[in-house]
Every structure is written in C-alpha cells, then in structure tokens.
C-alpha cells in the first residue's frame, strides 16, 4: 500500500493564563481546563435571538433499509482492509463526514454525486437520504443535541432535516459555500460563502444575521467555545473575531498580523483563549482570543526528503492543511501538504517533533484526554501518533484512494473515513493504555 494517489472576546473571556512562556523544562503537567461551558440559561439572556434551552433526548428512528453488498471501486492503492464497516451508497468521491455528538451512533456523509446520507455506524444501514442537492455536498453535520442534521453543497444550498422524523425542516440558498458549522449549544447554523459573508441562522425559524467581511471568500470559520464569538479566516489572509450577538468584529488581523495568503483552517483550544490559524503561506499563527494579538508563529522546518513533491516544488506547493490543540498538554499539531506533521510546544514555542508522511496530510484530530493525534492523508491511510515521543503508534488501511475527511468518536473507539474511492469506512481503534 505504498503507492500514492495522483490527486494531490468578549469581556467574559478568561485571561490568557496558558501563555506563561518559560524555559527549557520538560512539559509533564496536565493543563488545568476551564471548569465547563457557561450555563445555557445565562447565555440566552445575552443572545435573545438564540434559544439555548436544553432539549430532551430523543431516540432516532432506526427504521430504514439495509445496504446490499456492492463491489468496491478499484483504485491505485490495493491492499489489506482493516475496516469493520463499509458504506458504499455514494457513486463518486465522498467529501465529508460527521458523527452525531450525542450518541456517536450515526454518521452523515456528503459527496461529489450531489448526495448526502445519514446512516448507522454499527452496520452501515441507511436511515435516510438528504435529498434535493444540486451540486457536490461538501459540508455536513449534526446539531449539538443530534436532533437536526445539516448538509450544504458547493452552490450554496443548505438543508436541515429532523433526524427522528427524517423530514426536511429548513433550507436556504446562500452564495457559493466555503464552510458550515453548528453552534456548540444551540440550534443555530453558521456558514461562510465566497462573497465574504458569514451567515448565522436560527433553525428552523430561519432568523438570520450576516457578518460582512472583506470582498473575498470567507474560507474557514469556527465558533468559539463560549458560543458568543466566532473566528473567520478569509482568502486575502485576514482574520476576524466576530461578536455573534452584536454582529461586529471585535478584532481584525490583517497585513503583517494576518496571513500572506488564503486561510485554510482554524482551531481553538478547549477554553477558547487561544486560536490557531493556518494558511497557504505555510504559517500557523497563535492568536490570543482576548486581545486579538498574534502571540506565536510556527513555520515548517526543511525536510530532507519530500516524496510527494517534485524537486523545487516545496515553496510553491506546501501549505497548512489542518491543525489543532491537545487538550491535556500545551501542545499543538500542524499538518502540511508536503506530508509533515509538526508537534509544537506552546510553552516554549518550539518544534517538539516532526513526523513525516509519504504524501500530503488532509486532516488531523486530537484524541480527547490524551496526547495522541490522528492524521489522514492522500495515501489513503489513517495514522495514530504519540505527540509526547513523536512515535507512530499504528495505522489503519482499507481505502483504494485518498482519504478526504475523517471523524473520531468521543471515546476514540471508532474512526470514520471518507475517500475518493466512493466509500466511507468505519475502523475500530485498538486503544492501549495512553
């Protein structure tokens, strides 16, 4: 399986206590996390247009039809299949996957075939199709309580279904879609479009706010953990932190403070005090969400061998593709298109480990409560790395084309992947003591 695919704050924000930079001492202590999110009843007083009331847990309707076995799509990476379940209803590349956050028993996938499906992880059984899209479905996700599922296609058509009834409850046509995300504690959907707008809708009423950025695409975004702010990155390298209630930008980073190319990804730490942004300029910037100031810049170090790039292509081809914070140590991971996984020590702002893949990294995710980071790449393999040592723990194979997205269950027992081979796969993760 060695051959490679051809396709390439508001005033309430806690102080920046995690940025007490010090010397060369070894990082061995667990970072004390924020005691928890603010009470939803408090938030509703501050965002009167959003309902934060907890909704009762409902069991999803599990009626549906069982997938018939289908022939695999022959690709360029034949080899062993470590997966437990394969979902094969898509007829083209599968671009996105998300798991329902309440039970982690359902997945939603969207693909190049203009289709999205909600299906069960345990056996691949289809629950329902999210029908009616007219372009490639590039975004899909469940609401915070798993009662709603949203899908979005490249043309900007967004749709929301009630999971238990399988009925469409809302739709909207925005501009060309760049990203989409649910609010962490309310039935509120956010999306960024190519005209520079960030949209926020209350679902299913459709109450809407827009946040106008520069006249260029809003390429990535993330709601901060407090639910009151969002960080959005733009094609011109600008970063904006928005107040979701007031509709104004709290901080704007541009020019030398921003990036020198389009932003590709953004992440926040667990208490929302720090933001990481990545760009095609190959830089990852560490930003204080409180002050809006850049407090660290990470750049890739030269790697002797770059199997996935031709000679002299690194400066033109490399970029930051994915990044994220460890929840238990002051570490951040950055994944690059050239296949480099860089683990940075936030306390000393130094490179701690550099782990090389044979082809470009598509996405990375940290396992909750540990220092293990997962990567998926263009060679069709999922890898698990110990960020403390830089050691490869294990890998999972089974796709015959590049992996385009993946999701990790809350207990890290399942990895769900999507691929250019028209398949989604479920892998059972063997979890040794971390």
UniProtKB/Swiss-Prot annotation:
* Record protein name field: Angio-associated migratory cell protein
Q: Name one GO biological process term.
A: cell differentiation
Q: Positions of the region Disordered?
A: 1-63
Q: Which InterPro entries match?
A: WD40/YVTN_repeat-like_dom_sf, WD40_repeat_CS, WD40_repeat_dom_sf, WD40_rpt, WD_repeat_multifunction
Q: Which residues carry this modification: Phosphoserine?
A: 20
Name where the WD repeats lie: 89-129, 132-171, 173-212, 214-254, 258-299, 315-354, 356-395, 398-433
Keyword terms, alphabetized: Angiogenesis, Cell membrane, Cytoplasm, Developmental protein, Differentiation, Membrane, Phosphoprotein, Repeat, WD repeat
Query: What role is this protein assigned?
Result: Plays a role in angiogenesis and cell migration. In smooth muscle cell migration, may act through the RhoA pathway.
Q: Which residues lie in coiled coils? A: none
Where does the record say this protein resides?
Cell membrane; Cytoplasm
Acidic residues compositional bias, start-end = 39-62
Q: Which PROSITE patterns has this protein been placed in?
A: WD_REPEATS_1 (PS00678), WD_REPEATS_2 (PS50082), WD_REPEATS_REGION (PS50294)
- Which GO CC terms are listed, alphabetically? cell surface; cytosol; plasma membrane
